């Protein structure tokens, strides 16, 4: 699945926040892939000595969040869901790669799944019908409540991992279930704790994030633009710009690096909806996705 998804995501050339797939194949009993050389993942950066008291400042995690939403949006708009987003699967570009060094890349599509298919004859994307139940896929620390309930995962469930990770990165704070490795106990906390309980140490502008996600079903599209604006508000409150140093950086920002698409303060990219999917397939469309 990994090479299949990366091939699709790179079909139109180098993609933002996605490593290039340069070579892949199978020889004897071994499968191989050659892709863009990246840097450290967020888990490594969080625990490194570069970061004081662990965790990240609000100015850093707000920009990480925006780039993460951008990466997920690109994956979703190519008809896939990731199903295992966590700090181990989000990588910075290699520090010697000036174009990618400050960019968050999403990786590890081994649990990925197409949730929609493009039909050339109809010239439209058609969503797959949700299964009545689905196996648990992902990390139980960051998985959405829907995953614990064995519901079909959609775009919203990828985004559910976002607040959980950001809470963990927020100055080294802990999730309520941070040190609990009992799946049943983690499940009960996720299902019973209110968003206010979970987000108690977060900026007020983030309060709407979890209630919004809780209101969506498998077919509905998360409001990427609203989520973007939440993170952008945190940036503004912290007097941070996209060019500011991340917590792990020592050198001054390189102002010659071209701005990324997400740096537009209006968030125009996040307002687009090329799949035009926000509900279940019509009876006429069902035959195309079965």
UniProtKB/Swiss-Prot annotation:
UniProt cross-references to InterPro entries, sorted A to Z: CK1_Ser-Thr_kinase (IPR050235), Kinase-like_dom_sf (IPR011009), Prot_kinase_dom (IPR000719)
Spell out the Gene3D superfamilies in the cross-references.
Transferase(Phosphotransferase) domain 1
Q: Where is this region: Disordered?
A: 244-263, 268-290
GO-annotated cellular components: cytoplasm; nucleus
Tell me the domain comment.
The protein kinase domain is predicted to be catalytically inactive.
- So which domain of life are we looking at? Eukaryota
PANTHER family per record: CASEIN KINASE-RELATED
Query: What molecular function terms (GO) are annotated for this protein?
Result: ATP binding; protein serine/threonine kinase activity
* GO BP annotation list: signal transduction
Return the protein name.
Inactive tau-tubulin kinase ttbk-6
Q: Where is the Protein kinase domain?
A: 1-240
Q: Which family does it belong to?
A: Belongs to the protein kinase superfamily. CK1 Ser/Thr protein kinase family.
């Amino acid at each position: 699945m990994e090479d299949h998804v990366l091939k699709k995501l790179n079909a139109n050339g180098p993609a933002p926040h996605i490593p290039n797939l340069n070579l892949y194949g199978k020889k004897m009993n071994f499968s191989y892939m050659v892709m863009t050389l990246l840097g450290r993942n967020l888990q490594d950066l969080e625990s490194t000595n570069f970061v004081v008291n662990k965790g990240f400042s609000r100015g850093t995690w707000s920009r990480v969040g925006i780039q993460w939403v951008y990466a997920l949006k690109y994956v979703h708009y190519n008809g896939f869901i990731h199903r295992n987003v966590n700090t181990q699967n989000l990588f910075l570009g290699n520090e010697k790669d000036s174009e990618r060094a400050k960019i968050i890349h999403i990786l590890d599509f081994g649990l990925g799944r197409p949730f929609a298919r493009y039909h050339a004859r109809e010239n439209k994307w058609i969503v797959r019908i949700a299964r009545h139940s689905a196996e648990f896929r992902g990390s139980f620390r960051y998985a959405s409540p829907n995953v614990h309930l064995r519901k079909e995962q959609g775009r919203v469930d990828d985004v559910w991992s976002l607040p959980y990770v950001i809470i963990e990165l927020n100055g080294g704070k802990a999730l309520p279930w941070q040190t609990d490795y009992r799946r049943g106990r983690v499940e009960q906390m996720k299902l019973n704790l209110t968003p206010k309980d979970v987000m108690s140490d977060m900026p007020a502008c983030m309060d709407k994030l979890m209630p919004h996600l809780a209101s969506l079903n498998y077919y509905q599209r998360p409001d990427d633009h609203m989520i973007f604006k939440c993170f952008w508000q945190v940036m503004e409150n912290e007097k941070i710009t996209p060019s500011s140093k991340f917590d792990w950086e020592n050198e001054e920002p390189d102002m010659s690096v071209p701005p990324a698409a997400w740096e537009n303060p209006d968030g125009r990219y996040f307002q687009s909806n090329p799949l035009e999917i926000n509900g279940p397939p019509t009876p006429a469309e069902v035959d195309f996705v079965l």
